[in-house]
Amino acid sequence: MQAALTAFFMLLFSLLSLLGIAANGFIVLVLGREWLRYGRLLPLDMILISLGASRFCLQLVGTVHNFYYSAQKVEYSGGLGRQFFHLHWHFLNSATFWFCSWLSVLFCVKIANITHPTFLWLKWRFPAWVPWLLLGSVLISFIITLLFFWVNYPAYQEFLIRKFSVNMTYKWNTRIETYYFPSLKLVIWSIPFSVFLVSIMLLINSLRRHTQRMQHNGHSLQDPSTQAHTRALKSLISFLILYALSFLSLIIDATKFISMQNDFYWPWQIAVYLCISIHPFILIFSNLKLRSVFSQLLLLARGFWVA
C-alpha cells in the first residue's frame, strides 16, 4: 500500500513538473519570439521572460535531481552530484524569488491608485530600472550561490576525505545543512519575500478599495469594469497564496525535516514546486498577448484532433 502511494505521488509530481516546464517554456518562447521580432521588450515582458526562464530551469533541475537521487541514492549521497545540484538549485531559486518580487512591484506601481509623492515618483522611475534590477538580481543570486558553495564545500570535503561510509556521509551532510544553513537561507529569502509581500498587499488593498468604490457608485457586479477588477484581485490573491506556500515550503525544506527516506517526501516536493508549476498558467491567462497565442494553439490542436 505504501509503495502504491509513493508511486502515485511520484506520478503526480511528474505530471505537475511537465505542466510547469511546458507553461514556463511557452512563456519564454512567445516572448523570445517577440524580442527577436522587434528587438526590444516592455518592462513587464522582460520580467516575465526572465521569470519563465528561471522557473523552467529550476523545475527541470528539481525534477532531474529528485528522480536521479531516488535511483542513485548511494552514489549521489557520497559524491559530487549533491554539490552540483545545490549549486544550480540555489542560483535558480534565488533568481526566481527576486524576479517574482520585481513582478509584484511592477504590478503595484502600474495598477495601484496611491497618491503619495514617493509612490508617484517610483511609478514614473521603476519601469526604466527593470533591466538593471533583473541584472542585479542575477548578480546577487550568483554571489549568494558562491557563498553557499564556499561555506558548504570544505565541510563536505573534510568528511569525504575521511572516507566515511555513504550513510554516514549522508547523515553528516544533512546535519551540516540543518544546523548552519536554515538561518542563512531565511535571511536571504526573506528580503525578496518582504518586497513581494509589501507590494502585493498594497496592490490588493488598492484594488479592493477601488472595487468597493465602483459598487458604491452604482456599478453592478456584472459590470465589465467591476468584473475586470474582481478577476485581477483573484489573480493577485492566488499569486500571494502560491508564493507564500513556496516560501514556507522552502524554509521547512531547508531544515531537512522531511528527508528522502520520509514517507511524505514526494507530497512535500509537490508543495515545494507547486508555485512554479501553477502560477505560469495564471500569468498566461491574465496576459492578453500570451492568452491570444495560447488560444491559437488550442484551436490548432483542436483542428488537428478533429481532422
Curated annotation (Swiss-Prot):
Its main location: membrane. Glycans are attached at residue 167. The keyword Mitochondrion does not apply. Keywords: G-protein coupled receptor, Glycoprotein, Membrane, Receptor, Sensory transduction, Taste, Transducer, Transmembrane, Transmembrane helix. InterPro entries: TAS2R. It is found in: Membrane. Pfam families: TAS2R. GO terms for cellular component: plasma membrane. This is Taste receptor type 2 member 41. It comes from Pan paniscus. The lineage of its organism: Eukaryota, Metazoa, Chordata, Craniata, Vertebrata.
